[in-house]
Design a protein with these regions (language model features):
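Charged DNA-binding/catalytic regions of mobile-element recombinases
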Residues: 1-135
Length: 135
């Protein structure tokens, strides 16, 4: 998630945590940047984000930031997003397969980025807010 406009810029799916999952997600996110841009990549203290391979992937491309142990406020923005995702996409619905669930999440992420307005952005979606900011 880009903290400037709350846009989901990279995501991936798996049935269990694997390094290939976060590696692909990082590659997706970094591919959207200009070569001169160096983002801050923030994560929790999950085991995948502390590996030597992860740190090496970030070298010269991004600054690593990790949440403090036991401090939920460090990840408040993404936790808020997941609460919204659950309330708007999961509660009171049932899915018959993982593929069906994945398709619904992908559709929701397009909606969230391009159409779902945010009051903090004066009624603009994350993509609209970014476009306005950059123009």
């Amino acid at each position: 998630m880009d903290l400037a406009n709350r846009e989901i810029i990279a995501y991936n799916f798996a049935t269990r945590p694997k390094f290939s999952l976060v590696k692909k997600m990082l590659e997706q996110g970094l591919s959207r940047l200009k070569p001169t841009e160096c983002p801050i990549i923030h994560s929790d203290q999950g085991v995948l984000y502390g590996t030597a391979e992860w740190v090496k992937m970030l070298e010269g491309k991004a600054v690593q930031s990790m949440s403090r142990r036991g401090n939920c406020y460090d990840n408040a923005v993404i936790e808020s997003f997941f609460a919204i995702l659950k309330s708007e996409c999961f509660y009171s619905r049932s899915y018959h397969s993982i593929a069906e669930l994945q398709a619904e999440i992908e559709e929701y992420l397009v909606y969230y980025n391009e159409k779902r307005i945010k009051l903090a952005f004066k009624g603009l979606s994350p993509v609209q807010y970014r476009a306005q900011y950059l123009s």
